[in-house]
From Swiss-Prot:
Name assigned to this protein: Ferrochelatase
Domain of life: Bacteria
GO molecular function: ferrochelatase activity; metal ion binding
Pathway where it operates: Porphyrin-containing compound metabolism; protoheme biosynthesis; protoheme from protoporphyrin-IX: step 1/1
Described purpose of this protein according to its UniProt entry: Catalyzes the ferrous insertion into protoporphyrin IX.
Primary localization class, coarse: cytoplasm
Catalytic activity entry: heme b + 2 H(+) = protoporphyrin IX + Fe(2+)
Pfam families: Ferrochelatase
Species: Pseudomonas putida (strain W619)
Cited InterPro entries: Ferrochelatase, Ferrochelatase_C, Ferrochelatase_N
Compartments reported by the entry: Cytoplasm
Amino acids binding Fe cation: 189, 293
Similarity remark: Belongs to the ferrochelatase family.
Length: 337
């Protein structure tokens, strides 16, 4: 075994569906300044208020989608890890979570102790955001520096418009899209508008435009999460040959009262049902592995909302997970990182 490891990093999950474990996980997640970007005292107060009721609510949601093997996100990321071993001859393939276990700092320490000297760090997020990519890279660099680990890090960059990533989406989703359906909704995880605006100070970038990055500079496109989501969706629809009007984009998982990027998924579900859509397909391309946001928020609550609004069937298209084409594509992208 050589000294070059591949480290696949995903968001994370509570250790169990107990309220205590969910509270611990939510506290770690929400206290990350890249997630809740407020001054520490304000962030601590806000998170403390959220943790009064949210852990019990979230524990119920996790319990509704929990597998016998554990958290779907962790289980699916481990399956991806197992498949990637055959495609990475340079050293060990490991996984880490930004929040929860296996914790990123401990995994880096273990790799260094095993004699690894190079690590290709693969944040499993197609689109760029501070709350996903930046926080992973920052924690990895901080860990290496503070613990004096003899590790050289390389980072897989966001791949939202990489042709092979789009091909993997097509290969994974094609069996569902070859069936009859009325509309395809591509639902991405949402972000507060301020997360994007602070990355483009002085820019007149319109985050509510139908194509917000149409005339944007390369610097703005590199940090505009919304524009990258729209680009992923457009590339996928074009590659699949889905006509305009039969697909649309929305953003889910809004938390709090701040303005988030639009349109909101819950709004689109009602609009599509009332417009006459009976069978709705929903894809969530911001996630490469199914998780609470896909299985519970869309697959359960979203389906219930759509049917109550007049629709008849909502089909959740699985994420890439450990699809063979995705495994091959990810391996090639990591080789070139």
């Amino acid at each position: 075994m050589t000294d070059h490891a591949l480290l696949l990093v995903n968001l994370g999950s509570p250790a169990s569906t107990s309220v205590a474990d969910v509270r611990r996980y939510l506290n770690q997640f929400l206290m990350d300044p890249y997630v809740v970007d407020l001054p520490w005292p304000v962030r601590r107060l806000l998170v403390s208020l959220i943790l009064i009721k949210r852990p019990e609510q979230s524990a119920h949601a996790y319990a509704s989608i929990w597998w016998d093997e554990g958290s779907p996100l962790v289980v699916l990321t481990r399956r991806l890890q197992a498949a990637m071993v055959e495609h990475w001859p340079h050293g060990p393939v490991e996984i880490a979570m930004r929040y929860g276990e296996p914790a990123l700092p401990q995994v880096l320490e273990r790799l260094a102790a095993q004699g690894v000297r190079k690590v290709t760090l693969a944040p499993l997020y197609p689109q760029f955001a501070d709350s996903t990519v930046t926080t992973v890279v920052a924690l990895a660099n901080q860990t290496v520096a503070e613990r004096a680990l003899p590790l050289q890090l390389r980072v897989l960059q966001p791949f939202y418009d990489h042709p092979e990533y789009i091909d993997a989406l097509v290969a994974s989703a094609r069996p569902y899209l070859e069936q009859d359906y009325d509309h395809l909704l591509l639902s991405f995880h949402g972000l507060p508008e301020r997360h994007l605006k602070k990355l483009m100070p002085g820019s007149k970038h319109d985050l509510r435009a139908a194509d917000c990055c149409k005339d944007a500079s390369a610097e703005v496109r590199a940090v505009c999460y919304r524009g990258q989501c729209l680009a992923s969706a457009k590339a996928f629809a074009t590659r699949m040959g889905i006509p305009d009007g039969k697909w649309s984009v929305s953003f889910q998982s809004r938390l709090g009262r701040d303005k988030w990027i639009e349109p909101y998924t819950e709004t689109r579900l009602d609009e599509l049902a009332k417009a006459g859509a009976k069978k709705l397909l929903v894809m969530c391309p911001a996630f490469v592995a199914d998780c609470i946001e896909t299985l519970e928020e869309i697959g359960d609550r979203g389906k219930e909302q759509f049917i109550e609004a007049g629709g008849e069937e909502l089909v959740l298209v699985p994420c890439l997970n450990d699809h063979p084409e995705w495994v091959r594509v990810l391996a090639r992208m990591c080789e070139k990182a």
